[in-house]
Amino acid sequence: MMDVEQVKEIIPHRYPFLLVDKVVEIQEGEKVTALKNVSVNEPFFQGHFPEYPVMPGVLILEALAQTGAIAVLNIEENKGKIGFLAGVDKCRFKRQVKPGDQLNLQVEIIRMKGPIGKGKGIATVDGEVACEAEITFAIK
């Protein structure tokens, strides 16, 4: 388990773009489960949408990418490096995410070849799938 301060030691993201609050389970280089508490105070809710606040789908996807980055950047040989989003496949948004929701973020690394890898991510709220995608990343 990692709190947000420990997460910040692994990935370079910071407010307002750090989208992982806590890691609840990690298998280095293989699998990570993390949480994002979605607050009404998130800066994106000011414009998306003031009368009907919904977390932008691309930010749910980014939260999954950050979760996957934790899995691979926590490996000793990758510490201090940065993970870059290189591609997205089979992405589907199935549920809106609103203030007060807790995103459960699960990413399993399904392939690594040198600095390029792919992860399968699923974001859920109360057991319902909000987003699923295959995420390709590059480590530099």
Swiss-Prot record:
Molecular function per GO: (3R)-hydroxyacyl-[acyl-carrier-protein] dehydratase activity
InterPro entries: FabA_FabZ, FabZ, HotDog_dom_sf
Known catalytic reactions: a (3R)-hydroxyacyl-[ACP] = a (2E)-enoyl-[ACP] + H2O
Entry's Gene Ontology cellular component terms: cytoplasm; membrane
UniProt KW Cytoplasm keyword: yes
Record localization: Cytoplasm
EC number(s) given by UniProt: 4.2.1.59
Keywords: Cytoplasm, Lipid A biosynthesis, Lipid biosynthesis, Lipid metabolism, Lyase
Broad class of where this protein is predominantly found: cytoplasm
Lineage: superkingdom: Bacteria
Active site residues of this protein: 48
GO biological process entries: fatty acid biosynthetic process; lipid A biosynthetic process
Pfam families to which the protein is assigned, alphabetical: FabA
Family membership: Belongs to the thioester dehydratase family. FabZ subfamily.
Function comment: Involved in unsaturated fatty acids biosynthesis. Catalyzes the dehydration of short chain beta-hydroxyacyl-ACPs and long chain saturated and unsaturated beta-hydroxyacyl-ACPs.
Stored PANTHER family: 3-HYDROXYACYL-[ACYL-CARRIER-PROTEIN] DEHYDRATASE (PTHR30272:SF1)
HAMAP family assigned: FabZ
NCBIfam families named in the record: fabZ, PRK00006.1
Protein name: 3-hydroxyacyl-[acyl-carrier-protein] dehydratase FabZ
Primary gene name: fabZ
